[in-house]
C-alpha cells in the first residue's frame, strides 16, 4: 500500500511540525510567566490556562505521532489494514479517513457502545 505509506508519512510530518510549534509556544508561555505569581497576578490565571491548554495539545500531538509510527510499523510488518480485535480487513474508506485506525468499524462501534 504505497499510497497509505505516503499518507502516513505526510501525517507524521504534520505531527512533528505541530509538536515543534507547540513546544516553542509552551516555552514562550513559560518564559512570559517567569517570575509571575499565578496566584496573585491578574494575568496568572490566564497564563496557567494557556500553559495547561498548550500542554494538552502537545500531549494530543505526541499521541498522534505515536499512532502514526505504530501504523507505519504495522505497514512494514504486513498487519496494516487488519483489525486488531477481530482480524478482519479494515474498510479502505475508513483507512482513507483515519489512516491510523486499528479496528474495523463494527469493532470500533461495539467498543464505544459498551
Show where each model-derived region lies.
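Cysteine-rich micro-motifs
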Residues: 100-109
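Short alpha-helical
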Residues: 14, 90, 102-103
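Short functional micro-motifs and their immediate structural scaffolds
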Residues: 91, 109-112
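Short, cysteine/histidine-rich loop/knuckle motifs that typically chelate Zn2+
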Residues: 85-86, 106
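C-terminal structural segments of small proteins and small subunits
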Residues: 92-96
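Interaction interfaces in information-processing and related assembly proteins
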Residues: 1-77, 97, 114
Amino acid at each position: 500500500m504505497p499510497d497509505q505509506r505516503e499518507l502516513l508519512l505526510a501525517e507524521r510530518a504534520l505531527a512533528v511540525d505541530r509538536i515543534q510549534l507547540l513546544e516553542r509556544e509552551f516555552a514562550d508561555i513559560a518564559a512570559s510567566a517567569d517570575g509571575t505569581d499565578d496566584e496573585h497576578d491578574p494575568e496568572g490565571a490566564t497564563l496557567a490556562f494557556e500553559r495547561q491548554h498548550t500542554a494538552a495539545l502537545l500531549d494530543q500531538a505526541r499521541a498522534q505521532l505515536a499512532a502514526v509510527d505504530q501504523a507505519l510499523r504495522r505497514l512494514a510488518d504486513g498487519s496494516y489494514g487488519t483489525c486488531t480485535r477481530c482480524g478482519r480487513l479494515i474498510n479502505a474508506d475508513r483507512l482513507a479517513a483515519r489512516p491510523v485506525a486499528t479496528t474495523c468499524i463494527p469493532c470500533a462501534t461495539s467498543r464505544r457502545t459498551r
